[in-house]
């Protein structure tokens, strides 16, 4: 529950910032990223596009902020964390969809009226992406919203975008990777040749070997004693690494904590 409360608070703040930023539609003489003649902004068709843009921006931001409440009802598991992460990043991206629509619609209106395209519009794609090989700046002021955006033609701009893309991709892929680890069975197998030993596996990966002649005692626990992770992974169905266990001290584990536990000495 605490995780969901923190995520909902962060989501509400970030979506609110998105909304307040994207409300600023007139930047450097360009309306929603498109430069129009001086009196064109007052035309009914232009005002209709602007009003539709602002209306859909409000609707999407409200739905994204309110949608997080529904995630409180998901069971407390790795799945809920994954859904929250994907929903969070999706909610930050969705408010930009009205920007793409409004920019393209205004461009078509400009072309239909025969208004010339301003030279400053050429480097901008959909009013959001800036690509100007002759501009040495790594970042420039946004045309829709507040803040700056990277120059995708500059080396520093490309590096900044690449770092952000890699970081976001790593975050989005962490959940599925942990999900695979959590649902891959951990097991012990008895190996009799060439030596008699117990081998611990997680899926097809062998984690450690216990020679049979080194086992002096076997104890069965109906449930796993209270333990704290020192290093490693502690998922819902998979623990691997070093743990401190009540009455047993430091132990090395590779097991399903929900299964019956056999402690070997």
Regions found by a protein language model. Name each.
Residues 1-118:
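Transmembrane-helix bundle segments that line or gate the permeation/cavity pathway
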Residues 20-33, 108-155:
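Membrane-proximal soluble regions of multi-pass membrane proteins
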Residues 24, 28-31, 100, 179-211, ...:
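Conserved beta-hairpin
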Residues 48-60, 134-135, 140-141, 208-220:
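Acidic, Ser/Thr-rich low-complexity segments on the non-lumenal side of membrane proteins
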Residues 70-74, 80, 127-128, 141-142, ...:
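Extended interaction regions within the primary functional domain
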Residues 119-132, 201-265:
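Non-transmembrane, membrane-adjacent beta-strand/coil modules in membrane-associated proteins
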Residues 156-178:
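Internal/C-terminal transmembrane anchor helices
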